[in-house]
Every structure is written in C-alpha cells, then in structure tokens.
Amino acid sequence: TSGYASVLTNFTYAGGDRWTVTIPAKPSCTKVDFCIALDSTGDPWIKDGGDHSVTFPSDQKVIYASMKAGSEPEIAMPYNVGYEVDAEKQQVSYYYRDDAAFVDGTLKDMTVAVDVNGTEYPMTYNDATKRFEYVKSGLTDGKTYYRYKANGAYVVDAFNSNSEKHNNADYSYFEYYKLNATVTAEVMNKSFNYNENNVVKFKVEQDSSDAKTLEVASASIDVSSLGGSNAMPIEPELQAVTISATTDTTLGIKTLPITVTDQYGNKFSTTVDVEITDRVKENKKDFDWDEAVVYFMMTDRFFDGNESNNTASGADTYGDNPGLYHGGDFAGVTAKLDYLQDLGVNTIWITPIVENIKGVAVTDEGSKDVPYNAAYHGYWASDFTKLNPTLGTTGEFETMISEAHKRGMRIMVDIVVNHAGYGTESTFADMLRDKSVSEGDIKSWQSGLPDFATENADVRAKLVEWQTAWMMDYGVDYFRVDTVKHVDSTTWAALKNSTTKVNSSFKMIGEYFGAGYASNGSSLGTGQMDADLDFDFNDQATSFVSGNISSVEKFLSARNSALNNTYMTGQFLSSHDEDGFKAALMNGKKYTEDEATSAALVAATLQLTAKGIPVIYYGEEVGLSGLNNYPYQTNRYDMDFSKATKDNVTYQHYKNLLSIRNAYTDVFARGSRTVVASSDEEGYDVVSRSYGG
C-alpha cells in the first residue's frame, strides 16, 4: 500500500530496546500495511502476530510511528499542521516542523518564530511533539495572517492552502467567526437492551444574526456509560449515529453528552437520555449477537435443491468447471438446515443473493479452461433489487428464512456496496466514479470492477435503500459486508442507521481485509460495524500449531480483553478468498495430510473455544480444504455430505466442540481467559475460561 513493491526491509539498532526502520511511500499514499518478520527469509508464515497498518492524511510527508511487541503501531508525534484554533479558550496554537530537518536530525537546532499580523513571536521546540510551538491568546472575527521565520527565512504554512499577499508579503491565513447556535438531540427508542442498537440524532439551530452560515465540521457522543468511547464520532453529513451497550452496562437511565464543532472551532453541547433495560430471551433457542456461531457457505457450491434453476443465468454458465455455476441454491440450504442444526451452528452466512451479470466470457484474467465471468459467487451484481434466479425464487428465499427461524437459526446475507459487476457501466452510469482517477483504497476501481461513488449523498442513499429493503422485506437477520475498507465511513454509518431503524437487533459483520481486534480502520466502536472478520486469527492458529504456544496465548489474552458484544471479531481458519487452513499447511509448510488433519483439529479447538464469533467455512467440518489458486480455486469446492459420518474424526470433533460451546455459551462468549500451564518445548496449553465466578 506504500506504492512500492512488497520487500523485506531490515531494522537498524537504535540503542537500548529500540530498533528503527524507514519505509518509503509515494505522495498519494495514506496507509502502509506491514508485518514483522521473525527471520531474514521473509517467509509470510514466520511473523510476529498478524498484519499491521499505519494510516495518515495524504498531505503528510513524514510519519513517525512506534510499536511495542504484542501491540499495534501508534502515531508517535502529531501530524504536521500549522495551527489549531481553540475557540473555548479563545487562543491559537501555532506549530512548525521542517520535515527534512526532522529526518536529518537538525530540527531542534533551528531558530523559529511566528509572524502574526506583522508581529513576531519566538517559538519553543517541544521534543515530545517534535515541533516548534507558540500559543497566542485572543481571537477576532475575520482573517488572521501568519507566516514563519525559520533560520532567518520567511515561509508560509505548507499545510494550509489559504495564502495571499498581506502588507506586500506572502502570508498564510485562517478565518474565525464566533457563531451562536443551539443543539438538540433525540433518540429513536427511549430504552433498549445490550443486544439491541439505537439511533441518536442531533439538530443545529443557528442564530439568524450570525455573519456566517454554520457548517458542522465534526461531532461526537460520549457513550462511555454504555461501555464505549467518550468521543464516538458522529458523521457530520448524517448528524445521526447508531449506539449500543455492552453486556455489563448497568441498568437504568444514562445521560449521553453530545459535542458539535463548527468550521471555526466553536463548540456546542447537548445531552440525550437513554434507558438500558434487561435483556429477556424469547425462548431457549434465542441467542445474543456475541453468542452467534456462523457457518459460511458459497451457496452455489453447497447443495442443489432445485435443478430447474441451474441454467437461469445462461446455458453456458452451468457445468463441471470451477469457473461455472454448480447448482447450489436456496432450496438446497433449506434441505440441509437439519444438518446444520445438528452440527451446532446457529447462523448461516450465504453469499450475495442479488442478480449478477449473466453469461460466460474468457478474459485475459481467466484461462481457456476456466471461464472468468460466470458470477456463481455473487459478487458481480447487475441488479440490486432482484434475486439471482440461479439461486432460486422469492418463495424459495422466503421459505429458507422461515424454516431457519423455526429452528432458532438466523440468516446472514452477504452484501456488496463498493462495486457492481463487470460490464454494468451503462446500468449504473450516474452512480460510478471516474475510472481514470485512482485515489487510495476508497476512490479506485478494484480489480477493474465499476466502483460506486459512495461519497456522493445521492449514490449513498440509493445503495443504502437497496440493501435495507432485503432485511426489511424478507426478515434477513444479519449482513456480512464485503470490502469495508474500500467504502467511506459515512456510507457504513448510514447503512447501520438505516438497518437499525428497521430492526434494532440487526447486526453487521464486516470484511475489512487484514483487520483484527486491534486494527480495523476504525470500523468498530464507531457506529459502523458490529463486528469484523478476524484476519489475524488464522495466522495465529498457524503459529500455534507450529509450536509458538506462548506468543499466541499472549495474543489471545489481549484479544479476549479487547472484545465485547459491541466490538467483536469473527475468527475463521479458511475462506473463499484464502487458502484453506489444512491445504495451506500441506502446500506451504509441507505437512502430510495426516499431520495437517491433526493440526487442523488443534486449530479448530483454538477457534471454537476463543472469545469472538466462530466462522466455520463449509466443508471444513468434514475435512475438506483447498487452495485459493485462481482461477481454479480449489478452496471453492462442492460440499461433500457423504463425509459427515460417525467415523469421521474431524466431523465428530466439530460436533463435540460446538456442543460444549453451546452448553456454556456465556463462558465462551464473554468469559475471561487465563493460562493455567503451557510449554512451547513440550507442546501443551491448558487454559481456563470463566464467567461470573
């Protein structure tokens, strides 16, 4: 993501317990992803924890981050900005940092002053923030002109685009106006329990005598009394946010402070009251969000319950070929609900249900024997308002959901908001961004797929409307949200608000690629996702079965402490986009099949006894596994139910573990994790999980 090829870069010893490394990044870069290799080979399996990332504004030239073993990187000095207005204290803080001087170590030796409206004030170097600083009291309405005098030379603020001539010299400037407004707030439901969400919205009424029109620059709500952040962001464009409460939040009335900041730094405050009530389950089959056990299937590869729809997307799209439809459908899921219930799962994640592009086309990205454009997986939508006819009818979809609900099971539908399918440019012409413009993770066509301009309010509203309709009209329980990192936070907050208004118990788990409990692009705890898929977990499981027990236990302990029902991750071992756990051991680490099977059983034990939402990939429970070897993708195999026998050790292992988890769901969903005894050398790990004791 730095804009350069992935390379192994060595650290330089900096004395004491400090090591440093310099990573080049191209000007458009806003994020650097990396992992810490534990040896010089660069083997991706031999690393300290999972993937890590540092995110920063695009105007920054130098980022200084620090990281301790077992934790995530943190920005170690403030971003380079020229000034900050504190309207409450009626003062301005001026800052100066020469990035080149910082890099070569001469910054603190400079002499710097700030010239404000023609008067110079000496600035003092602050070693903690790595910059020169000066605080000036007093704010007046209108423009304030300023520039810096660095080692005798005048320079304008490189991080402020506002500059003009003032007294025949070049100056930067900012504007300030004291505005007057009243903020009020209201909550969707006066009361809710820990398994529900709620929507809070605010309204700003400005004094008509103000010289300028107020614009909301930022807003936040203090939900610390609900177990959350003391400054949870509220998207200014929405002026509404979804909130939730942790399971240990005490019952009763909670007062939530809201702060709104305008474009000049003026702050306005209000509060809203909510009541936390007791959670009463409807019956023995009812379960909480953090008690979900998910079974993820590629619907097309699971079971063919209605052969008449197999060629509904075109006669050439169905066949015995990894790039074609294989016949799995809604009717097939319904037919196997008893199998899934007997296994011990309570939530079924199915791949996207909407109509996808039809036909087959071999392109440069495909191969002659594996057609590329048969959209059996569901991620290439052509119409977000219709069901994919190859998966079944509206009636079959409704039957699948109702039959699952009769068994106390819930349906999680995979949705795509980021993009449409290949060749749909004319269909969505007024909703797409310019393909020729590529700006980071969000404003780019990923893999050539038509990318929605979700930052456009009209585009966002239409996409949210389409997705909300599925859960509102058919009783879908949860969404699995594709490509979270490629869509702006405002859109995710809007979708969360919309679904919460329809069903306060509705939840969303996001696919923020590379996310873990400590690094998720601020998609958790911010009114966006209720959970993210945990991309760190299978790396940790691989490390665990390789003998690194103590380091993995440290990771699991930290993860256990961080997670709660409002901030969850879903641990998986295999998926449709990654190598299967067992196959990866055989292919990458050269395990025999028996060795890989034994290791996979250990990994499954780790997964199903850990805090978080277990996500079982279809077929994994009977020993199936494959590689993400595009275009063949043997990890997208056809489910083989003949392997689900009493003699199948893997199958019985999963059933036994799930039976235990379901019997003590509060312990596994919310309990503490304590290591009783473990040894890397002797290869054992004894852990205590407890709750309420």
Model regions and ranges:
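C-terminal edge beta-strand
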Residues: T270-T277
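Exposed beta-strand face motif in extracellular beta-rich ectodomains
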Residues: T30-F34, G142-Y146, G252-L256
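Aromatic-rich carbohydrate-binding modules that target alpha-glucans
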Residues: T1-C29, L38-F56, S93-D141, K149-E175, ...
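Substrate-binding/active-site clefts of carbohydrate-active enzymes
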Residues: F287-A292, D300-Y474, W492-Y512, Y517-N520, ...
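Short, exposed coil/turn segments at beta-strand boundaries within extracellular/luminal domains
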Residues: Q263-S269
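Basic K/R-rich, polyanion-interacting modules in nucleoproteins and related proteins
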Residues: G70-T106, N168-L179, W289
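Short, solvent-exposed loop/linker segments at the N-terminal edge
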Residues: Y83-E88, K190-N197
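Active-site-proximal helices and loops of the catalytic beta/alpha 8
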Residues: G105-V112, E465-F572, G588, A596-T597, ...
